[in-house]
């Protein structure tokens, strides 16, 4: 009955859902619209230096092509969905135009594109690559093969923790969001965000892949994979980070970084020629 309702009647089934609808909707910030993060604005860090912006794309020849614009703070691990788009049976030109639009609006550091079969042509598109290269934006492929094909079931499901947990309301005994989400969604007034929320709350590993509506969920998953890499790398201990047990707090404070180019320029200026 659950599978029938989700696939053939396209109904949201809340019982034992992978993504709890209470948590997903509780992660939506009514005070944040879609668009780029603004330093110091609501729910945005004051210093944007540690924020990394990316866009995941799940392209398709037939059906929908999903775009998810995503940001992660490499220091705090906080995530934001900035916007989501989907195109129905798009032409290569329409996909190219949407990539250019996202690049101009959000200035992402990179695009992550599923690159199996037809999708590989998108990664190799010369016009797209020239446009992105002129703006310093990377285009990275995501390959689905025999070693990671279970990402669709286990990997996607692992994102459920990003939306936080529920607690029981003391008044009406109903589950409410605990406010502990790591991922923030903007208010769902746009078609892309609405569809992303619908795909999340109805997503189930029990439904065969060919019947799932998951274009935006997969584009979100590509971004989250990259976000985990960035957060893990930022927390890795570095030699210059003051992790030595033999350094006192005063010694750590007295250390600083120098620019070797500035030192070389200063030495060049002080050099006396005879």
Where in the sequence are the language-model features?
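Short coil/turn segments at secondary-structure boundaries
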Residues: 2-12, 18-25, 114, 173-177, ...
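P-loop NTPase motor core of the ASCE superfamily
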Residues: 3-7, 198-240
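Short acidic, Gly/Ser-rich segments with clustered Asp/Glu that frequently serve as metal-coordination loops
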Residues: 55-65
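Short, flexible loop/turn elements at secondary-structure junctions
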Residues: 12, 59-61, 117
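Short, well-ordered loop/turn and helix-capping segments at boundaries between secondary-structure elements
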Residues: 10, 105, 161-169, 222-232
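ATPase catalytic-site recognition across NTP-hydrolyzing enzymes
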Residues: 1-57
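Acidic two-metal-ion nuclease catalytic site recognized across multiple nuclease folds
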Residues: 17-27, 223-274
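Mg2+-dependent endonuclease catalytic cores in nucleic-acid-processing enzymes, primarily RNase H-like
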Residues: 69-203, 264-274
